[in-house]
């Protein structure tokens, strides 16, 4: 459960990322594919060359979904219900991949935000991404 301090930290990090969240999402997805090549299996239809337009576009989709989640931290299941259905029933993404992408997003944000990515912000964002992952995999039964 996210505390009030966690929610404030997550909102602060997301605001600092500002208009770059789409770019950071693409970079995090790139980092995931490079670090964990098995994650590429879900994207046979995409150009997975590092920095490709396909990766950047999907990374922006990820970032947009996270922006939605940041705005609905008190009701993540409601806000992410359609995405949960998509990932569980249609795409059938292995739940471990959400953890891998979350890790790569944390690394990406740390690289870009520097001193603004404090240990407290890191911990709060990690909890937030874990909560998002839990919601996205909640229908995997």
Curated annotation (Swiss-Prot):
Q: Which Gene3D superfamilies match?
A: Globins
Record-listed N6-succinyllysine modification sites: 7, 11, 16, 40
List Phosphotyrosine occurrences by residue: 24
> Which InterPro entries has this protein been placed in?
Globin (IPR000971), Globin-like_sf (IPR009050), Globin/Proto (IPR012292), Hemoglobin_a-typ (IPR002338), Hemoglobin_oxygen_transport (IPR050056)
Binding-site residues, O2? 58
Transferase listed as a keyword: no
Q: What does the tissue specificity note say?
A: Red blood cells.
**Residues the entry annotates as binding heme b:** 87
Which residues are annotated with the PTM Phosphothreonine? 108, 134, 137
- Domain Globin stretches: 1-141
The terms describing its cellular component in GO are: blood microparticle; haptoglobin-hemoglobin complex; hemoglobin complex
One Pfam family from the UniProt entry?
Globin
Assembly, in brief, is:
Heterotetramer of two alpha chains and two beta chains. Two external cysteine residues at beta-16 and beta-52 cause reversible polymerization to octamers and most likely irreversible formation of higher polymers.
Q: Which PANTHER family match?
A: HEMOGLOBIN FAMILY MEMBER (PTHR11442), HEMOGLOBIN SUBUNIT ALPHA (PTHR11442:SF48)
Function of the protein? Involved in oxygen transport from the lung to the various peripheral tissues.
Family to which this protein belongs: Belongs to the globin family.
Q: Under which name does UniProt file this protein?
A: Hemoglobin subunit alpha
Species name for this entry? Echinops telfairi
Q: What is the lineage of its organism?
A: Eukaryota, Metazoa, Chordata, Craniata, Vertebrata
